[in-house]
């Protein structure tokens, strides 16, 4: 069992900011994230930044005024590739920002509570038992619209 001052479940905006701040104050921190494709959270990966990038590329395409469907298809393909490159770069920077810190350990896997102070992180190949004095849940949320 590995012991930490804090365990943060979720590598989104709140989790990464909290982990960096706690590490700056000398805390030994574990961060668990289910998906390598979500380091940095929704805004970086599937929300604000990629959608705004695609809007920008659509505007640029409009200025170029492609004359055929094939040209539009190529513009779209290039926009998707550019968006993927951007989000990949941001994910990598966010990951390195925490993983390069001496007092932060990033675990990529599904985290669940074993007890009030223990978390199990299951990866594709292993399982880690972590103990934390403080545990923060930063997993995001999904909107549910109730039937009326």
Q: Where are the regions that the model predicts?
A:
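Beta1/beta-strand and adjacent pyrophosphate-binding region of the FAD-binding site
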Residues: 1-12
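Glycine-rich flavin
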Residues: 2-4, 21-27, 33-148
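The conserved SAM/SAH-binding core of class I Rossmann-like methyltransferase domains
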Residues: 9, 32-33
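N-terminal Rossmann-fold NAD(P) dinucleotide-binding loop
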Residues: 15-16
């Amino acid at each position: 069992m590995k012991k930490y001052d804090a365990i943060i479940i979720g590598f989104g905006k709140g989790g990464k900011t909290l982990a960096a701040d706690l590490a700056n104050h000398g805390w030994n921190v574990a961060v668990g994230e289910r998906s390598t494709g979500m380091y940095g959270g929704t805004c970086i990966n599937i929300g604000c930044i990629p959608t705004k990038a695609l809007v920008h590329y659509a505007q640029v395409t409009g200025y170029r005024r492609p004359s055929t469907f094939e040209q539009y298809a190529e513009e779209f393909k290039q926009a998707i590739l550019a968006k993927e490159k951007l989000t990949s770069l941001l994910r990598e920077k966010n990951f390195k920002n925490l993983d390069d810190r001496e007092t932060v350990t990033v675990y990529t896997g599904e985290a669940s509570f074993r007890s009030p102070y223990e978390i199990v992180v299951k990866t594709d190949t292993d399982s880690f038992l972590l103990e934390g004095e403080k545990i923060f849940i930063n997993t995001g949320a999904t909107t549910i619209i109730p039937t009326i």
